[in-house]
Regions:
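Gly/Pro/Ser/Thr-rich low-complexity, intrinsically disordered segments predominantly at protein N-termini
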Residues: 1-182
């Protein structure tokens, strides 16, 4: 079960323990704590990462697992998508000691039973407001992906359909079924 606490400052967030297995994010100053992902969640994230990593060979993007993105200082927002895609120039411009600033071009979240709809929706809104071109929300039980884009539009892709990244790069497609193949 996700735990949402009261308001937290950026300085207090940076002082939280690391390496204890808990997943922490801050959305508009509210700390969200989730238990570590279970194997199905991790496997789907791994498949998404592996499939998208083929785009790195084209030199256009970098693909990350659980990278941290600092969206704002006040109120603090820091999000760690399961998988994210950044344009190569943004990835290269970030020092190895810093968080990425702003949202990734594509953020991918695998829904966990412990994640509340409220927290998930706030995270999607924050990512889009921070500049994401799309947020893919993967629903393992339904075997579908909900795609959110700026302007309040969303649509669903199911097995037998394709996911696309028009801006990253044009012409690339991913069969939804590849995220769920055993």
């Amino acid at each position: 079960m996700a735990t949402t606490t009261g308001q937290i400052t950026w300085q207090a967030f940076e002082q939280l323990p690391d390496g204890d297995g808990w997943h922490r994010e801050v959305v508009e100053g509210e700390l969200i704590v989730l238990p570590p992902p279970k194997s199905k969640h991790s496997e789907i994230a791994r498949r998404a990462n592996r499939t998208l990593s083929a785009l790195e060979d084209r030199g256009f993007v970098r693909v990350y697992m659980e990278a941290g993105y600092k969206l704002s200082d006040d109120p603090p927002s820091w999000i760690q998508p399961d998988v994210s895609v950044l344009r190569m120039e943004r990835a290269r411009a970030t020092s190895g000691d810093d968080y990425f600033v702003g949202s990734p071009e594509l953020a991918i979240e695998v829904v966990s039973p412990s994640e509340t709809a409220r927290d998930l929706n706030r995270k999607i809104d924050a990512l889009l407001a921070g500049g994401s071109l799309a947020v893919w929300v993967i629903y393992p039980e339904e075997r579908e992906v909900r795609v959110f884009v700026p302007g309040g539009t969303s649509y669903t892709r199911r097995e037998g359909e394709m996911l696309t990244l028009p801006e990253l790069p044009p012409g690339w497609e991913l069969p939804v079924v590849r995220l769920f193949e055993d």
